[in-house]
Amino acid sequence: MKNLPLYVVIIVFACGVARAQTSAENPLAAARVFSFDEMKVRTAANGAESRRVFNGTLATGESVGAHESIQPAGTVPPPLHRIQHSEMVVVVKGTLEFDHDGKAERAGPGGIIYVALGTMHAIKNVGDGPAQYVVIQIGGDTRK
């Protein structure tokens, strides 16, 4: 049997180490439930709350992240900003206004906002009560 070139051995070893690290550190390495009670709450200066659900990598290679947010009525949202990933925003409660590409669109409970990679946008609560929504981030800089 011929000896394998050293670079082949190194590549195979590195792939094995990366796979082992992924399954140990990646919250998406296996099916599971993410308990709402275990998510740490971050509170912003404007009273908005955010809970990170996960950041990980799917078995198919895409980086994915998710967080849940509650934006009180009348709060000033973050300014227009550009993202380096795609997002799906699922409205749970309240009414959100999605400002993008020179237009404003509204979404209520059950509505889904799609934010394409690189879109300059802002999301604000335009309802009378708090707005609750879940953001699913896909690809790009999601791993940060």
Residue ranges of each PLM-predicted region?
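Bacterial N-terminal signal peptides
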Residues: P5-G16
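A short, N-terminal "cap"/entry segment at the start of jelly-roll beta-barrel domains
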Residues: A18-S63, P72, R143-K144
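Ligand-binding loop in jelly-roll beta-barrel domains
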Residues: G61, L117-R143
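Extracytoplasmic
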Residues: G61-A66, I83-S86, G118
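Conserved short histidine dyad/triad with adjacent acidic residue
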Residues: G65-I83
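Short beta-strand segments in beta-sandwich/barrel cores
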Residues: V76-P78, G94-D99, D141
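Glycine- and acidic-residue-biased ligand/ion/polar-headgroup-sensing regions
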Residues: Q84-L96, D101
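Short acidic-glycine-tyrosine-enriched beta hairpin
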Residues: K103-L117
